Amino acid sequence: MAERSKWFMFWVVCGSFLAGILAVCGLVSGVNWAGSDKFCGTFCHTMNGVAYAWKQGAHGRNPSGVTAGCSDCHLYNASEPVLGPLGYISLLGHKVVAASHSGFGQVIGRFDTPMTWLQQRPEVEQQEIGWFKGNNFHTCRGCHDLSLMYDKMNPSIGAWHALYKDQTLDCLSCHKDVGHDYKQVDEYIKTNNAYPPLDE
């Protein structure tokens, strides 16, 4: 009987270990999927206009081919090269808060049509700008090292950015449309009462 108990415990431990690994893999895969640009642009209906505007901005269509996606800018720790357990938990918390704003807005009708979305966008945009300012543009700095900024066509750009290296700054005061350029989206919605089609 004792021998059977040992084997039973062995399989319980192995099964629990395997279930834990599968649960963690499932969580990480789900979080990565829910943070993808495809999820934000096509699955989450409140983001259709935002996704189109992102594709018009420098982060969505950079001539170099390097793009910054939704999570890179809008999740506090997403631009970190390596995330420890606490950083990942913080990222999950921020993701839940961000998703709840969009989801709740969709449920109560705040973003249920392109026109209501267009009316609410300035307020939401100011909230996002406030978030960026509140964390001193941490996600911008996660990708852009201000001390390394250089443009051979305009060498003074490096000098100007270097001034802000250790200071509080407002990236959006100079780079307003870098993440999203809403001109075409706004015009399309006003004319057609619909979001512009997203090219896949």
Task: Give residue ranges: language-model regions.
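Short sequence/structural segments immediately N-terminal
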Residues: 2-200
